[in-house]
Amino acid sequence: MQAVERPVQTTDSLVDTTIHRRKTRAVKVGNVTIGSDYPVVVQSMINEDTLDIEGSVAAIRRLHEIGCEIVRVTVPSMAHARSLAQIKAKLAETYQAVPIVADVHHNGMKIALEVAKHVDKVRINPGLYVFEQASGDRTGYTEAEFAAIGEKIRETLEPLVVSLRDQGKAMRIGVNHGSLAERMLFTYGDTPEGMVESALEFIRICQSLDFHNLIISMKASRVPVMLAAYRLMAKRMDELGMDYPLHLGVTEAGDGEYGRIKSTAGIGTLLAEGIGDTIRVSLTEAPEKEIPVCYSILQALGLRKTMVEYVACPSCGRTLFNLEEVLHKVREATNHLTGLDIAVMGCIVNGPGEMADADYGYVGKTPGVISLYRGREEIRKVPEAQGVEELINLIKADGRWVDPPQ
């Protein structure tokens, strides 16, 4: 394969506000397509034991209904693998088809082969797929030993690859920084290089079997490691002429505000660089709470628009009304108008200029009076008490209002 040319940074590229995504192939996962010609896809994972058919179906449906486009389930045993057939059938019968990914770990060759019959994508971890017996007194691997284990991996992986290839299904090669195989640790260290080489070993096996429905992930719990691993993976794939999509995530990000910030620091940084085709925010919370974070990251970067974009200034001494309270009222009245940009600005000093890209603006004019804008044009001045109502009337007059869902 020929190397993929990466654009050289120039002055023009430094001031370019468009995110140029790394060119990747289209990989279908059920009825969803992942790749650079498609929107960045949002994923999550249910907490339920997949032996609980009803509970798993309900959990998958809950996630899908709030925007999770691909749902992953854990498959630790053959019994769990077989239950996926019932879960898929029950979803189709009572709801609709949802793309399902099976997560296979720990010497899971037979499990992966069984579950491949029932799901749309199988995720394997190169560090755990073939068990390597750790040796306490080992100090390294010879080339022959390294190659011998590589051949064992090929023998074990080939039936799964052939099954997925022949069914037109997908595989995620999901490397985790915390579970690199022993020989990778001895050879490359606990490094992004070791993560990349671990993925490349599996990719090459798949390519040799003419299987290319691959998605790659390089997850770590520390953001700097995760960033380095994905950047290096993208660089190496480009050099090798590989165009496989990347699944982004910071594993074990934690919960609350910091978990969200940590995930955004990793995922958002790479997306801004054009790296990444599907994302999962991993929080130690209910899976449903991951989905809004994903869509907020994508909206903030302009990669997907699934909600109203609110522009609002911080409060300062010039603010002519209670900005926080008014923003809350405006948001409450308009947050269903997906696709609009609405600005709420406290005064006319910076307001009109900083909200110029918004569709509509609500700007403090004088004490007790606000101005309503359509784009850069001031439409009317109204008493503050009528501001939100008149903003709605303006949107209605322009034919851009829809009633909120009941």
Swiss-Prot record:
Required cofactor names: [4Fe-4S] cluster
GO molecular-function terms, A-Z: 4 iron, 4 sulfur cluster binding; 4-hydroxy-3-methylbut-2-en-1-yl diphosphate synthase activity (ferredoxin); iron ion binding
EC number: 1.17.7.1
Keywords associated with the record: 4Fe-4S, Iron, Iron-sulfur, Isoprene biosynthesis, Metal-binding, Oxidoreductase
Pfam families: GcpE
Pathway the protein contributes to: Isoprenoid biosynthesis; isopentenyl diphosphate biosynthesis via DXP pathway; isopentenyl diphosphate from 1-deoxy-D-xylulose 5-phosphate: step 5/6
Note describing how the cofactor binds: Binds 1 [4Fe-4S] cluster.
One of the protein's GO biological processes: terpenoid biosynthetic process
SUPFAM superfamilies: Nitrite and sulphite reductase 4Fe-4S domain-like (SSF56014)
InterPro entries: Dihydropteroate_synth-like_sf, IspG_bac, IspG_bac-typ, NO2/SO3_Rdtase_4Fe4S_sf
Entry binding sites for [4Fe-4S] cluster: 313, 316, 347, 354
Catalytic activity: (2E)-4-hydroxy-3-methylbut-2-enyl diphosphate + 2 oxidized [2Fe-2S]-[ferredoxin] + H2O = 2-C-methyl-D-erythritol 2,4-cyclic diphosphate + 2 reduced [2Fe-2S]-[ferredoxin] + H(+)
Similarity remark: Belongs to the IspG family.
NCBIfam families, A to Z: ispG_gcpE (TIGR00612), PRK00366.1 (NF001540)
Biological function: Converts 2C-methyl-D-erythritol 2,4-cyclodiphosphate (ME-2,4cPP) into 1-hydroxy-2-methyl-2-(E)-butenyl 4-diphosphate.
Name of the featured protein: 4-hydroxy-3-methylbut-2-en-1-yl diphosphate synthase (ferredoxin)
Organism of origin: Picosynechococcus sp. (strain ATCC 27264 / PCC 7002 / PR-6)
Gene name for this UniProt entry: ispG
